Amino acid sequence: MAATLRELRGRIRSAGSIKKITKAQELIATSRIGRAQARLDSARPYAFQITAMLTTLAAEAALDHPLLVERPEPKRAGVLVVSSDRGLCGAYNASIFRRAEELFSLLREQGKTPVLYSVGRKALNYYTFRNWDISGSWTGFSEQPQYENAAEIAETLVESFMRGTGGEDEGESDAESVDELHIVYTEFKSMLSQSAVAHRIAPMVVEYVEEPPEVRTLYSFEPDATTLFESLLPRYLTTRVYAALLESAASELASRQRAMKSATDNADDLIKALTLMANRERQAQITQEISEIVGGANALADAR
C-alpha cells in the first residue's frame, strides 16, 4: 500500500512537471501567433497584387516565357514541402506529409517523377528516414521566416526549372532539372482552422478575365512588356514562396498553441484523478493503521 501511494505521488509530480512544460509552450505560441498573423496579413495583399499584375501582363502582352509555357511531355516535377523545425504541434506535420503523398501519387499517375525539396527539420528527417533523394533542404526558420530565406529557396527552384528540358530523353536531361514546380504548405484560415494545400507555381497559370466593353482597361507598358515581366517575375516567385512560409509559420504556431493547451488540460485532469486516488489510498492506509492500533489495544486489554 505504501509503495502504491509513493508511485501515485511520483506520477503526480511527473504530471506536474509535464504540465509546466506544456503551459510554457502554450504561452510562447500564444505570444508569437499575433506577430505571425500580422506579418501574414501584411504579405497577403502584396502577393495577391503581384500575381494579378503578372497574370494581366502575360495575358495582355501574349508573352512567351519559359515560366508561362506548358512543356511538352513534362517528366520531372519539383515539389517543395514546408514543415516545421520543432514538434509539439499536433497533427500539423502529419497533415503536410499526407497531402504531399497525395501529390506524389498524382504526379506519378501523370508519368512525372517527383523531385523533392524540403523546408523544416521534420520534413528533412521524415524523408531521409524513408530514403528519399532530397534535392534541396532548408532548416532553422520555420517559425519566423524572412524574405531572404524565401529568396534563397526561390532562386534554387527557378534554377532547376530553367534547366528543365521538357520532352527530351530522360538520359539527356539534367539530373537537377524539373519541368514543373509545386509547393505543399499549410494554409492559415483562423486560429481554429488550417489546412494542408498544394499549388503549382510554375509554369504560371494565366487566367484571362473578360471585362465588359464599357470598362475595358487599356495597358501601357514602360519600357516594354517583356522587360517589365522579366523584372517582376523573380519577385513573384519569391513572394509566392514567402507567402507560403508565412502561412505555414502562423499555422504551426496555432497548431502548437492548441496542442499544448489540450496537453495542459489533460495534465490537469490527470493530476486531479491521481490526487483523488492518492487521497483514497492514504485514507485506506490511515484506516488500516487505526484498526491495527485498536486491535492491539483490545488484545492488551484482553491479556489483562
From Swiss-Prot:
SUPFAM superfamilies xref list: ATP synthase (F1-ATPase), gamma subunit
Similarity comment: Belongs to the ATPase gamma chain family.
Compartments in which it is found: Cell membrane
Function: Produces ATP from ADP in the presence of a proton gradient across the membrane. The gamma chain is believed to be important in regulating ATPase activity and the flow of protons through the CF(0) complex.
Membrane topology qualifier: Peripheral membrane protein
Tree of life domain: Bacteria
Gene Ontology MF terms: ATP binding; proton-transporting ATP synthase activity, rotational mechanism
GO-annotated cellular components: plasma membrane; proton-transporting ATP synthase complex
Record-given protein name: ATP synthase gamma chain
One example of a Gene Ontology biological process annotation: proton motive force-driven plasma membrane ATP synthesis
Subunit structure and binding partners: F-type ATPases have 2 components, CF(1) - the catalytic core - and CF(0) - the membrane proton channel. CF(1) has five subunits: alpha(3), beta(3), gamma(1), delta(1), epsilon(1). CF(0) has three main subunits: a, b and c.
Alphabetic keyword roster: ATP synthesis, Cell membrane, CF(1), Hydrogen ion transport, Ion transport, Membrane, Transport
